[in-house]
Amino acid sequence: MNMRIARRFFALGLISLGLILMTITSVAAWAASAPQVKTKSGAVEGRDDGKVHAFLGIPYAAPPVGDLRWKPPGPAPKWTGVRKATDFGAHCMQGKVFDDMVFHDPGGSEDCLTLNVWVPAKHSAAKLPVMVWIYGGGFVAGTTSEKRQDGSHLAQQGVIVVSMNYRLGVFGFLVHPELAQESGHNSAGNYGLLDQLAALEWVHENITAFGGDPGNVTIFGESAGSFSVSAQMASPLAKGLFQKAIGESGAAFSRSGLSFEPLAVREEKDQKLVTGKLGVSKLAELRALPAQKLLDAFAPPQSEGFDFGPDVDGYFLPEPAPAIFGAGKQNDVALLAGWNHDEGGFEITFSPQKPAADSMKERAQKDFGDKADQFLKLYPIDTDEHVRRSALDYAGDRFIALSTWEWIEAQSKTGKQPIYRYRFDMAPTPSNPNAPRLGAYHSAEIEYVFGQLDSKADVTWRPEDRQLSDMMQKYWSNFARSGNPNGPGLPNWPAYTSTDGWPVMFLSDQPAAHKDDLRDRYLFLSAEWAK
């Protein structure tokens, strides 16, 4: 009996020893295969899933805390040894503003200036094209850790994908007279845009170590990220840091939802805001406040959350973007840009009313006076369906489409590089049959571009959705590679020129190029709103 027990313990001991050795071997194998890269600040170790090497949460600038709050980003601190880069960095301070952003709880950290790099695990190119993503969120929300913006699938198209966090809301865009005085160039605000610029400088200095080409960088973004792309094109500070640009829904033009106001206007407005809500007005007092107190004062429910945004500061933006593009002073790079078919809901234009023929007439008279009849020819209201569609179209035009069109139009007049325009028409199908059908709504294209359809669980994804996602990843990465989205097996996407009738690529279950049949509408709106 004792011998039998001894044998059993001996056998169990061998099994345990085997498991321990297997674990040690597995850990050693993982450690040996974990990719390492030496950046200017120090070595980083990422993770390898067999398809992509991911390096997450790499600091690209000094933490903007304490006396560095509301200052342009400084150099990232150096470190010794190997820094683990296997987890996303903290998201920047923000409140809960958008229901579709389910990636985090409100809050975050001021120490948030990190970026992520996704590199194809196997590639033959000596230098890979680089795509730098700028998230949207109205300049008040957003983070790189949102799953639908994960670059691991897109990188498998043979590109390096980079994404960065940047300061938001009051932390990224406060304008104050004392900030202008201490700046050295009499400017204030736009710290979030300067963060983006610092990330681009980091890419320029470090991406070669990851196998990327610093001379072939494409910036791309959606909504506020697209506004940012147009602003980086307009900024003389960004010259030479990127060679191509992709804008998805938005630009720093026209009466968009995110207007870039003059410095003097913002100084007065922001001072009233901070004094009224915080009871302090001196810069030293504001810098001494806890970050959470600042956030709580300007985030829902205390505010709608949109009190602070970019301004024409005289430094990052010497003039408004339309003036810079109009004079041909922009960073002239190849541009791919467009918007979604259903960018805005009725509430943007008609809240609290529902659209009807009479309310459309009232709106036309209010907005365009003696040109109301011309407006109604462009937005017909002769049937209930036309009223519904025209109300949606006008809401989307006011919110996003017109500003994006004006950006494309300005670049076509003074730029010399090719332009490709699209309209995203694919309407995701809700899994819940009782859920509202929102069409090709604002931001709907993000999952397709990144190949992250499965990140959105409340949608029933069809084979047509997956096919379009595959095409869009190829179009976007081809454009990043060569400045031309076309490639083998893809429907032809002609450049945006008057010779071909200003063609627009409709991205749907049957992607195809069409002549622009809405040009008169945008010419009318642009001319009227310029008055």
Language-model segments: which ranges?
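Bacterial N-terminal signal peptides
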Residues: 11-26
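Surface-exposed patches in mature extracellular/periplasmic domains of secreted proteins
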Residues: 215-217, 280-285, 419-423, 487-494
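Serine-hydrolase-like catalytic core of hydrolytic proteins
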Residues: 97-283, 315-350
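Non-catalytic accessory segments of hydrolases
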Residues: 2, 29-190, 214, 455, ...
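Short, solvent-exposed turn/loop segments enriched in Gly/Ser/Thr/Pro and often Arg
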Residues: 167-170, 220-224, 423-430, 491-497
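N-terminal secretory signal peptides that target proteins for export/translocation
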Residues: 1-12
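Substrate-gating cap/lid region and adjacent catalytic-acid/histidine neighborhood
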Residues: 244, 252-257, 281, 285-464, ...
